[in-house]
């Protein structure tokens, strides 16, 4: 009777509390909009984001991240790849990214999308400040990234995307 109902309410309440805590502090999902991460991610892909990642360790080169952008009165979340880390000197000419003078190997780029002369705006030599990263989309000609936004503060990183979970045909670890 009443005891069973009370037990049921407690179980549901605890489950909701746990779900809210996980969503708020640990894990989020993100729906990819636009084509800036083609061909790694496609519009409509859904990814899980570890929101604790950068509370436990610093961002890493190559990490796929969700970042929070505020431009004037507009707020939105973007998904990009970390290319440059604090203290790095980054530059890009004719689609070739150099970090501290060394060519950055980027096996995740689709050579049919990023081709010499077709990679959007270049990057003049820039040193990345402390507690900031330089992000770019894998679809270089079609990405709104640090080339336009500037370097991104660590505090604007929502977390590290680590898996595409939907649609099933696109399932992959990032």
Where are these regions (language model features)?
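Soluble "head" domains of membrane/secretory-pathway proteins
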Residues: 1-5, 9, 21, 25-31, ...
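Hydrophobic alpha-helical membrane-embedded or membrane-associated segments
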Residues: 11-19
């Amino acid at each position: 009777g009443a005891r069973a109902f009370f037990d049921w309410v407690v179980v549901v309440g605890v489950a909701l509390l746990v779900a809210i805590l996980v969503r708020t502090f640990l894990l989020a999902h993100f729906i990819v909009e636009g084509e800036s991460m083609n061909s790694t991610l496609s519009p409509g892909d859904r990814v899980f984001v570890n929101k604790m990642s950068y509370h436990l360790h610093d961002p890493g080169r190559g990490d796929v991240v969700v970042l929070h952008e505020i431009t004037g009165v507009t707020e939105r979340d973007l998904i990009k790849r970390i290319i440059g880390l604090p203290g790095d000197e980054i530059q890009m000419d004719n689609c070739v990214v150099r970090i501290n003078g060394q060519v950055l190997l980027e096996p995740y780029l689709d050579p049919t999308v990023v081709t010499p002369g077709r990679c959007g705006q270049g990057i003049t030599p820039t040193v990345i400040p402390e507690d900031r990263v330089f992000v770019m989309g894998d679809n270089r000609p079609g990405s709104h990234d640090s080339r336009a936004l500037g370097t991104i503060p660590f505090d604007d990183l929502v977390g590290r995307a680590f898996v595409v979970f939907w649609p099933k045909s696109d399932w992959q670890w990032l």
